């Protein structure tokens, strides 16, 4: 493979991660000035250890060398999504109902593009977020990015 897209990379990475008994949370691929980075996030009910990341990294390195989806040199990182995890798919929000989230929209809605508040529901491809005393119903198709936004001060 000469070039890579997120979909192509996921087709290669997901089965390897899941075959090792982990949940594939998502991936990021960035290439800037010849410095490319493939970051893969894995999850497990019992949590993720450094050894887990090393094991997945070793296996992915072999698979990626064979499949060769990235034509240039790149660095591979495998990690847990962490407490302030990024959401990659709508279904991932469902797990965090009741938690603080930060959602950025593609275009402004009600005078704002960023909504930081408590995720109160997910239904029908829509996120319901309670922000500053108001409940907002945001269609997922409007969402550009989202993440858990822990309140470390509480």
Where in this protein do the model-derived segments appear?
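Short Lys/Arg-rich amphipathic alpha-helical segments
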Residues: 1-154
